[in-house]
Amino acid sequence: MEEKSFFIFVSQEKLPELKELAEVIQKADNKIFYEAMSYLVKSYGFLGEKVDFEKRKEILDLCLQKNIKADSISNEELPAIAKTIEIKKADFDSEILTYENQQLKESIAIKDLEIIAYAPIQTENTKKVRQIEKPNMVEKAIRMGIMITTAIPIGTGKNKEVIKEVKEIDVELYLDLIFKNKTRIRINANDFDFSCLKEEKELSSMINFKRLCFRLKDYSQAYKNSAFYDLIEGKLTTTLKYDNISDLEKEELRLILAKTKNS
């Protein structure tokens, strides 16, 4: 019979300071402080994954010693997260959120909002551009010297058309809203009209996105992820690092487990 494996997770909504969690990881996994911190910025509140019963007990005991709320769940019991409904338009007040999904309008109660999770995800695209390059000063000087020496009118060089690869870096802002009935709505700031902000709507999608987040914070008692707290607390960078959307979803899973534990 295969031995059970466990996931250890922080069971409170807001993560403790990472340096506190790092002390647990240092002792449990025999890591130096830097290694523990590097692990934590990509673990999204999980302190152990697929660990055996003895390691589970060790990590939970260390958390208890440091007054860190933590719990475990077996690999087999991990819940599945619902597929996202990506929306481009919505309207809401303190009671109801109405959104459009495939030309159909759906409404859902704000009081049933359980998880709010935000992540800034950097994307890098490469495109080819045509550019005209003029002869540089060295080339011009050499050709001028040849003309003076030989009296042959070879000119100072011609413009050249070259094709170069240019890297473009962009940041996409994602916001997931998870409700009691498992509905998971996703907003991409670059593809959302923000008309729900009415007179507060600005030209900048980043400003609009932040205003939307603040309004949701005021309307809801939902659990919020680390990056959402960073945003509303005015931090310039996020505590955790999000390379792709699956990182955000991993943190959402941790919040779902914590919410279930504390319900």
Question: Across the structure, where does each feature detected by a protein language model lie?
Answer:
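Phosphoinositide-dependent membrane-docking surfaces
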Residues: 93-99, 105-129
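Anionic N-terminal interaction surfaces
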Residues: 49-90
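Extended, charged low-complexity segments
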Residues: 151-263
